[in-house]
Amino acid sequence: MTTPPFVWLISGCSTGFGREIAISALEAGDMVAVTSRNTEDIRDICNKYPSTSVALNLDVTYTDQIIECVRNVISKFGRIDVLVNNAGYGYLSAIEEGEGEEVSKLFNTNFFGALELTKQVLPVMRNQKFGRIINNSSQAGLMAN
């Protein structure tokens, strides 16, 4: 088992829970790969914690970006102890009114993006014989309103 400080890879850190989880982990003394589709949105976090964080561009709908991100985390920190699948967004519409293209885009981000990121990180965790994966979702995905 790995002991602290832990190495975190967190998707979707520009706002909300992803941002707060990244800051909390850094304040606890852990190392964090802070990701966003636009690294300017997370630059302030990494400027505050320059030796224990790295800002990485990541759009989870692109497998090549996921692969590159995981490689960069391993290159910077040597391992990944905690993966937080947080990237995602909501689409407010009744299911029968949802536009096919928009619903497809939502699933590509919220489900398939997390799945692909997990697929790329799992071999790393298996190799190091330790790892935790946290999947963040919306209450709307669990309970109808």
Question: What is the meaning of each model-derived region?
Answer:
Residues 14-16, 38:
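Conserved glycine-rich cofactor-binding loop
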Residues 28-44:
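Conserved glycine-rich Rossmann-like NAD(P)H-binding loop of the short-chain dehydrogenase/reductase
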Residues 58-68, 100-101:
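The beta1-alpha1 cofactor-binding region of Rossmann-like NAD(H)/NADP(H)-dependent oxidoreductases
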Residues 72-85, 91:
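A glycine-rich helix->loop->beta "capping" turn
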Residues 94-95, 99-104:
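Substrate-binding pocket helix/loop in short-chain dehydrogenase/reductase
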Residues 118-119:
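A short, exposed helix-loop element centered on a Lys and neighboring polar residues
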Residues 138:
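Residue(s) in the substrate-gating loop at a strand-loop-helix junction
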